[in-house]
């Protein structure tokens, strides 16, 4: 069964249901079912390999008990069963005594804010049966199909309104991971992990390079990948994604990674590698903005993440992240953050990405920054990745591909003795000494695109782009008004 056939069949069934409204709800609905199916498969393995293992999920709510039978409970009785199941799984005892391996905690936290949107128990049974028909984890092809279906759903997020913020195109995550060059045993962290794209790209990188070949290697991998995600929907997606990639109990917390002050991080919490695409265009409240020192304080989410990332890296730690153009040319507090970055880290490479990499979610220009903590920057290499031949812009139907990174792959070179060998300046690449950057008031908007072209999008993509940008502006206005109202209330106005 082809991935596209399964995905289409599931969408066709759910489209009939009155409770499903749009791709984001379709994806959430499918994902909680895939999570329960995947977790039940894990529990069956644990039961087979550990005689003392006792299932986390109560017997009547295990997928293999209530969902596997194609002629099983359906209609209103099925809806009632799912409601009772959610209630029970959200109230599992997650104390250390009862849950030493944090498996109950995982189920509880994943399902805490998840919804069953479907109104028809009959249609829900059809969806469940289709999932069971096409995905069998005991077959290799079944696992591959699961990953294919899941990755396809995550890709759909990019055009699913505001939910697009949680998805980073996989060619981007794979490129960043390849050039961070993680080693098995290094601690790897994504503080804004969304659907888990960077973390699963790390796992795939290790597998592609035959780095995980023994039980001990597998255990090391399990214990070195970590993440944080603030919102429940992408958290569900991330956990299920990591389960599908072989992580038994993903070490991903639901929290705001910016909530603690940067001075509070302990040596034990610091990591070797951070790969991330922090939210940009958003604003944090005043309390969160105070989690960094005064001279670096503002409400721009991406700026705050960068300050936290610098604090979380060990000396010698490496980072690859996505940041918008606004950070590169920004002044004031942004200049202060860039000054700190250049003084405390070796910002060795900035890749200027084409404008529509994240289309249709956003048309904001983005960049990939690579740096190492613990030594100051001597100079920065810039590379402008041009739109590939035959493309005016990327879109849902013509997305960015891994092959589009070939020009920068060929240029990248090799770091030897603290210097890059094989790199050369050209009409798309430039080396800028740090003294010139300082003299330019820390402006990093260099080696940019010389000509702006007007994008003429198809009507459906133009409307989606307009609605997304309108929603983003409205959210920022609401955030600012909320801060003003809070300030007025504090002063008794």
Which positions does each model-derived feature cover?
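Helical mechanochemical/support elements of P-loop NTPase systems and associated helical scaffolds
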Residues: 6, 22-26, 123, 145, ...
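Conserved S-adenosyl-L-methionine
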Residues: 165-276, 281-283, 292, 299, ...
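Short beta-alpha connecting loops at secondary-structure transitions
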Residues: 223-226, 288-294, 352-354, 390-397
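A generic structural signal for well-ordered coil/turn residues at beta-strand boundaries
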Residues: 270, 274, 364-365, 376-379, ...
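C-terminal, active-site-flanking charged/polar segments
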Residues: 346-347, 359-410
């Amino acid at each position: 069964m082809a991935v596209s056939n399964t995905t289409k069949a599931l969408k066709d069934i759910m489209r009939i249901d009155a409770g499903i409204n749009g791709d984001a709800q379709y994806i959430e609905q499918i994902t909680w079912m895939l999570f329960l199916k995947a977790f039940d498969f894990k529990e069956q393995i644990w039961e087979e390999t550990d005689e003392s293992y006792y299932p986390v999920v109560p017997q009547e709510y295990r997928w293999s008990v209530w969902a596997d039978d194609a002629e099983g409970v359906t209609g209103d009785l099925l809806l009632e069963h799912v409601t009772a199941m959610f209630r029970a799984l959200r109230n599992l005892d997650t104390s250390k005594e009862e849950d030493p391996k944090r498996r109950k905690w995982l189920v509880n936290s994943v399902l805490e804010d998840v919804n069953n949107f479907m109104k028809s128990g009959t249609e829900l049974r059809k969806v469940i049966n289709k999932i069971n028909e096409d995905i069998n984890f005991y077959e290799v092809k079944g696992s591959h199909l699961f990953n294919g279906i899941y990755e396809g759903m995550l890709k759909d997020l990019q055009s699913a309104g505001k939910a697009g913020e949680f998805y980073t195109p996989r060619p981007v995550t794979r490129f960043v991971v390849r050039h961070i060059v993680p080693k098995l045993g290094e601690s790897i962290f994504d503080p804004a992990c969304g659907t888990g794209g960077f973390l699963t790209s790390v796992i795939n990188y290790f597998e592609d390079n035959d780095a995980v070949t023994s039980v001990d290697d597998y255990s090391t991998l399990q214990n070195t990948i970590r993440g944080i995600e603030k919102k429940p929907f992408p958290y569900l997606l991330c956990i299920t994604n990591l389960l599908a990639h072989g992580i038994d109990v993903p070490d991903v917390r639901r929290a705001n990674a910016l909530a603690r002050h940067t001075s509070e991080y302990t040596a034990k919490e610091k990591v070797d590698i951070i790969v991330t695409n922090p939210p940009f265009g958003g604003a944090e409240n005043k309390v969160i903005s105070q989690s960094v020192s005064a001279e670096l304080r503002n409400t721009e989410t991406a700026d705050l993440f960068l300050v936290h990332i610098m604090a979380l890296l060990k000396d010698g730690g490496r980072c690859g992240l996505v940041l918008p153009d606004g950070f590169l040319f920004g002044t004031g507090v942004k200049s202060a953050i860039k000054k700190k970055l250049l003084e405390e880290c070796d910002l060795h490479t900035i890749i200027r990405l084409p404008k529509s990499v994240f289309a249709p979610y956003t048309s904001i220009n983005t960049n990939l920054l690579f740096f190492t903590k613990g030594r100051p920057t001597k100079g920065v290499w810039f590379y402008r990745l041009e739109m590939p031949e035959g493309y005016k812009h990327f879109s849902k139907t013509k997305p960015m591909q891994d092959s589009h990174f070939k020009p920068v792959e060929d240029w990248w070179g090799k770091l030897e003795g603290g210097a890059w060998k094989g790199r050369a300046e050209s009409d798309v690449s430039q080396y800028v000494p740090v003294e010139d950057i300082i003299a330019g008031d820390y402006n990093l908007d260099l080696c940019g695109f010389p000509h702006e072209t007007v994008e003429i999008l198809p009507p459906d993509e133009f409307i989606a782009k307009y609605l997304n940008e309108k929603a983003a502006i409205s959210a920022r206005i609401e955030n600012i008004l909320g801060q003003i109202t809070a300030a007025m209330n504090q002063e008794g106005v």
